[in-house]
Amino acid sequence: MKETGIELMKNTKSVRDIDVKDKRVLIRVDFNVPMDEDFDISDDTRIREALPTINYCIDNHAQNIVLVSHLGRPKGRNAEFSLKHVLKRVERLLGRDIAFAETIENVENLQQQSKSGSVILLENIRFYEGEEKNDEELSTKLASICDVYINDAFGTSHRAHSSTCGIAKYAKECVAGLLLKKEIDSFAKAMANPLKPVLLIVGGSKVSSKLALLYNILDVVDKIIIGGAMSNTFLKARGFDMQKSLVEDDLVSEARKILDKAKEKKVKIYLPVDVVSTDDIKEHRHIKITPAQDIPEGFMAVDMGPATSKLFSEVVRDSQTIIWNGPLGIYEIQAFSRGTFNLAHAVSDTYAFSLIGGGDTADAIDKAGERDNMSFISTGGGASLELLEGKILPAFEVLERK
């Protein structure tokens, strides 16, 4: 990554750099957690990750703390997306009662009645039409209920919305929360000043979504492992017949360009040497393991084979910094999860600093049972991808610098 961008974000002031005593604090958290149809939360990681900043403000005697978050993509007010569904879990994890405010006006009333150190959760901020438009009126309203604005929602830091950007124009003090700081420090450790050799593991289904990342990262890394359906397009660029495998035909020449550029910059790219293939993803009665160039007619590659697994594990072992973005096979189907899981075990066995991009990658690491053995797992999917692409995230641009 171009050092300037990440260094600029690394110099953001955090809540530890200011005094919150007797001040009204508004924290933009990310409580956008997955739930089942009965509104039971299946993974509360995002709530847990927000606790250190909330507790820091309580311990340092903030007058009151307003928590602001979105949940899903509601179109207007919709009970299905109410943050009431997460209130009990937040109370349990925080170990205290939390007042619930249906509206911003309601927050003001609660602030006047509340005792010092009380916590208020505002209803889903996306119920306000102006939120995603970064509307000035909503931004000023939010700023009016706080003396200090803290952004701790890394997962939405690539979005220029009222609660992540607009509010900062009107709030008296604007700083990063402890999670936001931890995220940017981890990315800086992996990209701005990494221990070498640096390895990028990149997967997922689309080359198109990882193009900017690949071009940007060639200046940072020493080697790249490309897996998942993405690797099919690169294997085709090397002249292999990929049969029925998912290939982005319009990007084969782009893949060739990346391979050439990597060679020019002396970055070694590793692709699968053998693959697991099937003629039917749903039924998968017929499964074959063949060299990558010998996929049987009518079959599609769905995972890396054992020789690739061994090769990739050796590459991992010889790395000091590992950045991983995107799973390397259809890990949700047990029969095709071995490649991704084996690699997760290999990464956990190293002493390297491992930075895991959010979203599907974090989910795959979870399913492999290796969450606790990674150095840092990002809470943001889209946000972490944009950082790897070398972008400055909008939410960081509006916060105060040291």
UniProtKB/Swiss-Prot annotation:
Record-listed substrate binding positions: 30-32, 46, 70-73, 126, 159
Main location: cytoplasm
Residues that coordinate or bind ATP: 210, 332, 358-361
Family membership: Belongs to the phosphoglycerate kinase family.
Upper lineage: Bacteria, Pseudomonadati, Campylobacterota, Epsilonproteobacteria, Campylobacterales
Biological process annotations from GO: gluconeogenesis; glycolytic process
Name of the protein in question: Phosphoglycerate kinase
Xref: InterPro entries: Phosphoglycerate_kinase (IPR001576), Phosphoglycerate_kinase_CS (IPR015911), Phosphoglycerate_kinase_N (IPR015824), Phosphoglycerate_kinase_sf (IPR036043)
HAMAP family xref list: Phosphoglyc_kinase
Enzyme class: transferase
